From Swiss-Prot:
One of its GO terms (molecular function) is mismatched DNA binding. Its EC number is 3.1.-.-, 3.6.4.-. PROSITE patterns: DNA_MISMATCH_REPAIR_2, SMR. GO terms for biological process: mismatch repair; negative regulation of DNA recombination; rescue of stalled ribosome. Pfam families: MSSS (PF20297), MutS_V (PF00488), Smr (PF01713). Keywords: ATP-binding, DNA-binding, Endonuclease, Hydrolase, Nuclease, Nucleotide-binding, RNA-binding, rRNA-binding. Signal peptide: none annotated. This is Endonuclease MutS2. NCBIfam families: mutS2. It comes from Streptococcus thermophilus (strain CNRZ 1066). ATP binds at residues 328-335. It is an enzyme of class 3 (hydrolase). Belongs to the DNA mismatch repair MutS family. MutS2 subfamily. The keyword Isomerase does not apply.
Length: 783
């Protein structure tokens, strides 16, 4: 794109507005070199970068790259085998540190999905070894002692010599203080000296290095420290030589990585530039426009970026609209509207956010041409018209259907009739060439051209006749009208004169009345649109507020629910643990039988009713939401029917789950238990487990049921297992159990029947249905 348009529209001043948001010299250089692009993919990629940066700022408000120098010159010197100085190495050190920080930031970044920026983050290369080497130079420009063993040794000797000199001079100060002009150790020519009174200069042997301007003080290096000072001078030279060697070594370490370091520096600068674009967008209430795939554009509430408190206007260039002619008197803001359109296009095609509202859309033009100058002076000359025409000729010879043309005061500077005809002919040529054009003019003849010609539309700038001031509001579709009579009347011109003037221009007055009606309709429409926008904004704010309140309420509800559940569960667990502990102690001390333990526990329950969490609808719903994930082997559960805790041990092929509930194994469907989150309980001593079988597919009652299989057992063994099984079932509040004894000789079956008949906690028992085992299985109801 031609660079002339950048000067005409003051694009560099727009770029200067971004400077305050940039931290790195690399970003400043990128901004300086920024020019409009014509590749839609490149432009869209830069818009995507800004959008993704805004998402990063949602999660990390303080995201920043930090202040970094441009290291392109030091890297160039490295490629020429030159050694870098301390400041250049510090600059590279900071770039490497910033690269590592940015890489870590990306690794820790969450809740943000990146596409364009992802490619940049992943191209950053870390150099931990180089960073470690460069730590030998601190940010103050001092080479640390640990940079090399030799440097450390030299500085150790320097300190020893310096301490010896200081001690020697301190001794002289104490002994000969009366001979000194001041009681201090001075320095001259890099050597430690004493300020001796001139009258005593011969009393202290040594070398005179300086005399005060008054001649009263002589600065003498005592003979006792001359040798030490000589050694310090030599050590200083050795130190400089060693530091130069260290700088050379560090430069050699960096040399093979110049390309990668340069790439890191560019990425850091580019990230900083993207950050600056986002901050500009945020501060100026700018937006990222859409890109049209044809040459249509729509700018909503677009503002001129260089004006303070600019008036926002809507502007559109539909596909079937080629030329917009802004007519009307001067000083109304026509030129500003031209520049606003031009700058919006330049900014968008440079990958910058524009000052407009969401929904705005820009086109991509290969070239933008403008002829904009100050034509409002009454002292116009032929040279002005010649210059104007020269520019127009250049534009017409170069522009094509992929261009945007902006012309201010087309045809001005010559005879009005000829100028109007010339302007009309130029606009017609641009229209037939399908070149998007916006032109301003004060020629009334062009109003009719805009009305009568296809693909051409009139526009004007609103003028407030009440205040006699322009409002700078752009009215597309409404031609400009003269306000001379109204202004003259309001300024006090005799009404007779005004009427006479109006009678002389009856035709124009009719046209002006029509235009006035159009203006009124346009203003009314704009007011309605603004009202609709205000309502939309209020609705948006209200929706956000409601959503925020809902989220806060949901969060507090979940917290309180979880807190209540935890407190209740802790109370229940504590009560049960205490009761179990009491019963265990009783059992251990008095050797109570299991059924007596059951009786005792029943009495405890009657004395202090337990909270039945399984019937609490709110908690059940909360648990159901919390346990939305699929159950897994090892999960802690609560059996819904009994409120008992257990652990899932395996899953059967039919989808049911095997669970260990105390000493009993149970077969459960997925809807017969809920998952719970508990701390791992201390392991209890292993106890003999009861062998059980899977539950039959059909039973006489619903819900989970425990089973005992006694088939193949001897009488004594079977009775022991039956007694332990019934006790455990009662302890776990189970209402029904199944005992599989088979038919065989009938010995075990009869023994089971006798046991159940005499057990006080067995309400009733019966054989299972024929389909579930018949007389080979007994179902007992407990209570």
């Amino acid at each position: 794109m031609n660079t002339k348009i950048l000067d005409q529209l003051e694009f560099n001043k727009v770029k200067d507005q971004f400077t305050e948001y940039l931290q790195t010299e690399q970003a400043q250089a990128e901004l300086c070199d920024l020019v409009p692009m014509t590749n839609p993919e490149r432009i869209q990629n830069q818009f995507t970068e800004i959008q993704e940066m805004s998402e990063i700022f949602v999660e990390h408000h303080g995201f920043a790259i930090g202040s970094l120098r441009d290291i392109s010159e030091p890297l160039r010197r490295l490629e020429l085998d030159a050694d870098l100085n301390i400041q250049e190495l510090i600059a590279i050190k900071k770039v490497l540190q910033a690269s590592a920080d940015l890489s870590r930031f990306y690794a820790d970044l969450e809740n943000v999905e990146l596409i364009a920026l992802k490619r940049l983050f992943e191209k950053i290369e870390a150099f931990p070894s180089l960073q470690g080497s460069l730590q030998s130079i601190n940010d103050g420009g001092f080479i640390e002692h640990f940079a090399s063993p030799e440097l450390q040794n030299i500085r150790r000797q320097l300190k020893a010599c310096d301490d010896a000199i200081r001690q020697t001079l301190q001794d002289i100060l104490k002994k000969s203080g009366h001979m000194l002009a001041e009681n201090l150790i001075a320095s001259r020519n890099g050597r430690s000296v004493l300020p001796v009174k001139n009258t005593y200069r011969n009393r202290i042997a040594g070398v005179v290095h300086d005399i005060s301007s008054s001649g009263n003080t002589v600065y003498i290096e005592p003979r006792a420290v001359i040798q030490l000072n000589e050694k310090i001078t030599q050590l200083r030279a050795d130190e400089r030589h060693e530091m130069a060697r260290i700088l050379h070594e560090l430069s050699d370490q960096l040399r093979p990585h110049t390309a990668a370091i340069a790439n890191n520096a560019w990425i850091l600068g580019h990230m900083d530039f993207i950050r600056g674009k986002y901050l500009y967008l945020h501060d100026k209430k700018a937006i990222i426009p859409e890109i049209s795939d044809n040459q249509t554009l729509q700018l909503l509430n677009v503002r001129h970026p260089l004006l303070i408190n600019p008036v926002a206007n809507d502007l559109r260039f539909d596909e079937d609209l080629t030329v917009i002619v802004i007519t009307g008197p001067n000083t109304g803001g026509k030129t500003v509207m031209l520049k606003t359109l031009g700058l919006a296009q330049l900014m968008a095609q440079s990958g910058l956010p524009i000052l407009a509202d969401k929904g705005s859309r820009v086109a991509i033009f290969q070239e933008i041409f403008a002829d904009i100058g100050d034509e409002q002076s009454i002292e116009q000359s032929l040279s002005t018209f010649s210059s104007h025409m020269t520019h127009i000729v250049e534009i017409l010879n170069t522009a094509d259907s992929n261009s945007l043309v902006l012309v201010d005061e087309l045809g001005a500077g010559t005879d009005p009739q000829e100028g109007a005809s010339l302007a009309m002919a130029i606009l017609e040529h641009l229209r037939l060439s399908q070149i998007k054009t916006m032109a301003t003019t004060h020629y009334p003849e062009l109003k009719a051209y805009g009305i009568e010609t296809q693909h051409v539309e009139n526009a004007s700038m609103e003028f407030d006749t009440a205040t006699l001031r322009p409002t700078y509001r752009f009215m597309q579709g409404v031609p400009g009208r003269s306000n001379a009579f109204e202004i003259a009347r309001r300024l006090g011109l005799n009404e007779i004169i005004v009427k006479e003037a109006e009678n002389l221009t009856d035709t124009d007055s009719d046209v002006n009345r029509i235009i006035e009606q159009l203006e009124a309709q346009t203003v009314e429409t704009q007011k309605r649109l603004e009202h609709i926008k205000d309502v939309e904004q209020e609705n948006l704010k209200f929706n956000r507020a409601v959503k925020k309140l809902y989220n806060e309420f949901s969060h507090e509800y979940d917290k309180e629910l979880e807190k209540a559940q935890k407190e209740i569960q802790e109370m229940v667990d504590t009560a049960l643990a205490e009761s179990d502990s009491i019963l265990k102690n009783l059992h251990d001390k008095s050797q109570l039988k299991p059924h007596e333990v059951i009786d005792a526990k029943g009495k405890l329950k009657k004395l202090a009713a337990q909270v039945d969490l399984s019937k609490n609808k709110v908690l059940r719903k909360a648990k159901k939401e919390k346990a939305a994930r699929a159950p897994r082997v090892g999960d802690d559960i609560i059996v819904t029917a009994y409120g008992q805790r257990g652990t899932l041990t395996s899953q059967a092929k039919n989808g049911n789950w095997e669970a260990q509930v105390g000493l009993i194994k149970m077969s459960l469907k997925a809807d017969e238990f809920t998952l719970v989150r508990t701390q791992a309980e201390a392991q209890q001593p292993k106890k003999k487990q009861i062998n059980v079988v899977k539950k039959a597919k059909k039973t006489s009652s619903d819900g989970p049921r425990a089973r005992l299989d006694l088939r193949g057992k001897r009488y004594e063994e079977a009775m022991q297992e039956l007694d332990a099984f019934i006790d455990q079932a009662l302890l776990n509040n189970m209402s029904q159990v199944e005992i599989i004894h088979g038919i065989g000789t009938g010995v075990i079956r009869d023994a089971v029947t006798k046991y159940l008949r005499r057990h006080r906690h067995v309400k009733n028992f019966e054989y299972a249905p024929q389909s579930a085992g018949g007389s080979g299985c007994t179902i007992a109801t407990l209570g």
